[in-house]
């Protein structure tokens, strides 16, 4: 790698990178991947600045060669590449002359045209993840962030890419060339995998002085220092049988081990009450898409323009009316909010400027829907600590809900195939080792089975919505920003397709902590009449907004089109996990792999091909009241994926608790089926801990119902 760096980069860049590494006590000969990363970053900073000037009229111009006497000023001040002292001197000088806010961290450039500092990022990972790490580290809206990746993707604050397309294309081409050169020398994989997240001060935090002495004093007996204790804790592995653990417990604990037989377990008690309601962040089986094929309109790829183009494909709009009110809400406000969206989209079309984002007017209906000024006033603890009867307010127990049939229908629909492909095969290089060949083969077979699955559509929809909402929450904290809900796919014929599901309007979003909540109003198109299952739509106000002509076997029929509107909320940590929902593909692939491995070890050869291509064989999918359901290997792949996706979409403390506690009972039942004669104590306590998680969550209630079916058939 070191040789490659010296051949590939300009000697001046190499020298600057060496200096920078030595300044931090790092050796370019040892940390070669870091050496390459620093050189790449330096080169991108220089390319970003190259040929960009400001003329005597204060306009930004691009001049690659010309009159050396022209009165031109460099548009960008390069800060990256200077030693720290000099770099801070330059930053201070800029702040003094331009009145710019002083950044906490050294930026890479200063843009004299836009009057802002610029942070350049070059990542080997996904751009949105690296962008968020940068934004979280910098924590300043004044510094503009621009991220490039080696795959040609880029991301910038407020989608403002600063430079013209040609300048950015030069940078992307150079990065792609570096990647190809590395790959041809077998260096790329190591370089790609070596990238770590943004380091923070906390990671290098050392306990010293008084705190160190206090830490050493507060250790358990027999430990002389914190280091010794850490080593012990890191290497600690509990072992020993149940009886020996019980003997160490208090003498007051009276635990007698009871035999566990087929008659011991009882079904889980599923609560009664009104039927459970839909609580996912966006509509699933009931969603309706307005789509455009082979998009080539002006501004294609900018969500706002994609959305307007999709809206224009529908001609059946009519005066909206409420068909299912929200019991507790001010329903006319939701109606006015939709009318406001339509009006402001129309205004956008009439404007001469082309804004990339749309901030809604802060009308009374939106303020109400987004909970503006509704948060209770915070009082400093110092001002009220002397109040004698200060206590936490009483909160009611959550109302229990019964299992409703709609959640099983949702799950069945998620396992079905659609007529579009939602994921592409990854462009990964040639396989070198035999194990890579097998892994690629499995991945390709699996991708073929799930690429058209509706659960995969939910994945891509979830990634888009969470990414867009988190970006808007960071970039436009005080604004009520309009965010289209968009996904992209390919038709059977391979044509690109852009889909619009509806819109989100986000509220104020000063998200300091991971759990701070941002409110949003979702408005989603649907053909589902809410009056058939009103309990499912308890949290929604539903409007009829148009009539859609549908082609059927008997000709065209007109169906009413509905808009499902609700106030919702999410947090930074939930959005981060929502962006990671692609991991569900990996989890379900690993489950399939373990099935293939089990089969391969019996046959003593790799069974991947036979596993996927033997269409006559069926596999167990799950339990139902009828018994064990079986299906093709493709159905198994899609069912496992749908379960993983629903675990993400319906994530909750109830699900966490139910999964952890029911697993214990599952293992005991499995041990009984394997004739291992399991023994238990306090089985009643285990049932209690499982059933306290069965409250009102639809996905948990469905899993409990499946668990009961499993118990019935497993113990026959």
Swiss-Prot record:
InterPro entries: INFV_PA, PA/PA-X, PA/PA-X_sf. A motif (Nuclear localization signal 2 (NLS2)) lies at residues 184-247. Pfam families: Flu_PA. GO terms for biological process: cap snatching; DNA-templated transcription; symbiont-mediated suppression of host gene expression; symbiont-mediated suppression of host mRNA transcription via inhibition of RNA polymerase II activity; viral RNA genome replication; viral translational frameshifting. Keywords: Cap snatching, Endonuclease, Eukaryotic host gene expression shutoff by virus, Eukaryotic host transcription shutoff by virus, Host cytoplasm, Host gene expression shutoff by virus, Host nucleus, Host-virus interaction, Hydrolase, Inhibition of host RNA polymerase II by virus, Manganese, Metal-binding, Nuclease, Phosphoprotein. One of its GO terms (cellular component) is host cell cytoplasm. One of its GO terms (molecular function) is endonuclease activity. Its cofactor is Mn(2+). Mn(2+) 1 binds at residues 41, 108, 119-120. Binds 2 manganese ions per subunit. Plays an essential role in viral RNA transcription and replication by forming the heterotrimeric polymerase complex together with PB1 and PB2 subunits. The complex transcribes viral mRNAs by using a unique mechanism called cap-snatching. It consists in the hijacking and cleavage of host capped pre-mRNAs. These short capped RNAs are then used as primers for viral mRNAs. The PB2 subunit is responsible for the binding of the 5' cap of cellular pre-mRNAs which are subsequently cleaved after 10-13 nucleotides by the PA subunit that carries the endonuclease activity. A motif (Nuclear localization signal 1 (NLS1)) lies at residues 124-139. Its EC number is 3.1.-.-. Mn(2+) 2 binds at residues 80, 108. It is found in: Host cytoplasm; Host nucleus. It comes from the Viruses. Phosphorylated on serines and threonines by host kinases, including human casein kinase II. Belongs to the influenza viruses PA family. This is Polymerase acidic protein. Influenza RNA polymerase is composed of three subunits: PB1, PB2 and PA. Interacts (via C-terminus) with PB1 (via N-terminus). It comes from Influenza A virus (strain A/Equine/Tennessee/5/1986 H3N8). The gene is PA. Its main location: host cell.
């Amino acid at each position: 790698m070191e040789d490659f760096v010296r051949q590939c980069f300009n000697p001046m860049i190499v020298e600057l990178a060496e200096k920078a590494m030595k300044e931090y006590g790092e050796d370019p000969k040892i940390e070669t991947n870091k050496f390459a990363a620093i050189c790449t970053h330096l080169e991108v900073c220089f390319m970003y600045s190259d040929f960009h000037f400001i003329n005597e009229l204060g306009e930004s111009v691009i001049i690659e060669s010309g009159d050396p006497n022209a009165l031109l000023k460099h548009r960008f001040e390069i800060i990256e590449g200077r030693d720290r002292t000099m770099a801070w001197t330059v930053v201070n000088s800029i702040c003094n002359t331009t009145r710019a806010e002083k950044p906490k961290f050294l930026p890479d450039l200063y843009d004299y045209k836009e009057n802002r500092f610029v942070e350049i990022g070059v990542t080997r990972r996904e751009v949105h993840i690296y962008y968020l790490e940068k934004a979280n580290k910098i924590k300043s809206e004044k510094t503009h962030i621009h991220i490039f990746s080696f795959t040609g993707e880029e991301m910038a604050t407020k989608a403002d890419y600063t430079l013209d397309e040609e300048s950015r294309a030069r940078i992307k081409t150079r990065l792609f060339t570096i990647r190809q050169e590395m790959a041809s020398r077998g260096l790329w994989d190591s370089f790609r995998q070596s990238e770590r997240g943004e380091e923070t001060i906390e990671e290098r935090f050392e306990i010293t002085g008084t705190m160190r002495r206090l830490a050493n004093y507060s250790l358990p007996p027999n430990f002389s220092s914190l280091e010794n204790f850490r080593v012990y804790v890191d290497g600690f592995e509990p072992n020993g049988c149940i009886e020996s653990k019980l003997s160490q417990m208090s003498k007051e604990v009276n635990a007698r081990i009871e035999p566990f037989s087929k008659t011991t377990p009882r079904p889980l008690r599923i609560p009664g009450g009104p039927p459970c309601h839909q609580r996912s962040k966006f509509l699933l089986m009931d969603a309706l898409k307005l789509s455009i094929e082979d998009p080539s309109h002006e501004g294609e790829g900018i969500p706002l323009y994609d959305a307007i183009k999709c809206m224009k494909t529908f001609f059946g709009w009519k005066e909206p009316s409420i068909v299912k009110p929200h019991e507790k809400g001010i329903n006319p406000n939701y109606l006015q909010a939709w009318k406001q969206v339509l009006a402001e989209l129309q205004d956008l079309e009439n404007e001469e400027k082309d804004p990339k984002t749309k901030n809604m007017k802060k009308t009374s209906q939106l303020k109400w829907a987004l909970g503006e000024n509704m948060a209770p006033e915070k009082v400093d603890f110092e001002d009220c600590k002397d109040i004698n009867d200060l206590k936490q307010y009483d909160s009611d127990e959550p109302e229990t809900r019964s299992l409703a049939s709609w959640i099983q229908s949702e799950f069945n629909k998620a396992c079905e195939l659609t007529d579009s492909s939602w994921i592409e095969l990854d462009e990964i290089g040639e396989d070198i080792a035999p194990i890579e060949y097998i892994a690629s083969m499995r991945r390709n077979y699996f991708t073929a089975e799930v690429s058209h699955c509706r659960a995969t559509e939910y994945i891509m929809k979830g990634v888009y919505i969470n990414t867009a909402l988190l970006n808007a929450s960071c970039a436009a904290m005080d604004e009520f920003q309009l965010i289209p809900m968009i996904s992209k796919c390919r038709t059977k014929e391979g044509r690109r397709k852009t889909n619009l599901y509806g819109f989100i309007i986000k509220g104020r979003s000063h998200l300091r902590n991971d759990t701070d909540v941002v409110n949003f109003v979702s408005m989603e198109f649907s053909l589902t009449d809410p009056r058939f299952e009103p309990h499912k739509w308890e949290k929604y106000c539903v409007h009829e907004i148009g009539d859609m002509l549908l082609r059927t076997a008997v000709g065209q029929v007109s169906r009413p089109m509905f808009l499902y509107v609700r106030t919702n909320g999410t947090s930074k940590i939930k959005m981060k996990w929502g962006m990671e929902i692609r991991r569900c593909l990996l989890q379900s692939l690993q489950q399939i792999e373990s099935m293939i491995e089990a089969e391969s070890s019996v046959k003593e050869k790799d069974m991947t091909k036979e596993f996927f291509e033997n269409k006559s064989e069926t596999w167990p999918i799950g339990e139902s009241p009828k018994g064990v359901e079986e299906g093709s290997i493709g159905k198994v792949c899609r069912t496992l994926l749908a379960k993983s996706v629903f675990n993400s979409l319906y994530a909750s403390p109830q699900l966490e608790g139910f999964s952890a506690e029911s697993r214990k009972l599952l293992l005991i039942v499995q041990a009984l089926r394997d004739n291992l004669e399991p023994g238990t104590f306090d089985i009643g306590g285990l049932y209690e801990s499982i059933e306290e998680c069965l409250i009102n969550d639809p996905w948990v209630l469905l899993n409990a119902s499946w668990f009961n079916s499993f118990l019935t058939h497993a113990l026959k």
